[in-house]
Amino acid sequence: MTDHTPALQRPATRTARLSAIEQALLTRIVTSQSQLSQILADQGIEVTQATLSRDLDEIHATKTRLADGTVAYAVGKQNIDEHPASNPDAKTEQQISRVLSGLVTSVAAARNLVVVHTPSGAAQYVASVIDKQPIEGVLGTIAGDDTVMVICSEDDVAKRRAQWLLDVASKA
C-alpha cells in the first residue's frame, strides 16, 4: 500500500525541528545521529551534530537494543518489543484504544474528513492523542469542545480511518 500522505512542510524553528526528530524516531529505526541528520536533511532541515545531540537529549531519546540486537534511538516509553517500525498498528491501536474507548460517542466520514464526537470537554484530549500517533494518511486534527475533525489525505483514507477509529474505540 502506497502512502499518499503529502509531505509536511515545517517552519525553520527549533520546535518544528524537535517535532521532526521525534516523529522520525517514532516511525523509523534510527541507529545513528548521522542517519537522523540525513532524514532531517531530506525534509529540508539542516542541523549540526552538536545541535542534534542536544535535541536528542532534550526530547529524552535513548539508545535501546531492539529484539533483533540492533541498537536504535527510542523516544519516551518505547521499549524493545514495541518499536513502531516493527509493529506500528498494534502499538498505535493499543495507545489510542485506551483513550478512545470511553470518550468517542460517534464517528463519521465526510470526504477527506473524519468527524469524531465526544462528551463535552473531551475533544481536545482525543485530538491530542490522535495527533501524537503516526497514523498513515492522517494529516492532523482540529478540536472544539465535543467534536474532533480529523483531516485525512484523501477521501478513501477518511473512510478507512473512520472505520478504524470506530473499531479501536469499541475494543474496551
Swiss-Prot record:
Record bears the keyword Transcription: yes
Transmembrane segments: none
UniProt subcellular location: Cytoplasm
Main location: cytoplasm
Pathway: Amino-acid biosynthesis; L-arginine biosynthesis [regulation]
Keyword annotations from UniProtKB, A to Z: Amino-acid biosynthesis, Arginine biosynthesis, Cytoplasm, DNA-binding, Repressor, Transcription, Transcription regulation
Pfam families, alphabetized: Arg_repressor, Arg_repressor_C
GO cellular component: cytoplasm
One example of a Gene Ontology biological process annotation: regulation of arginine biosynthetic process
Protein family according to the UniProt entry: Belongs to the ArgR family.
Family annotation (PANTHER family): ARGININE REPRESSOR
General function of this protein: Regulates arginine biosynthesis genes.
Protein name according to UniProt: Arginine repressor
Organism expressing this protein natively: Bifidobacterium adolescentis (strain ATCC 15703 / DSM 20083 / NCTC 11814 / E194a)
Organism ancestry: Bacteria, Bacillati, Actinomycetota, Actinomycetes, Bifidobacteriales
Gene for this chain: argR
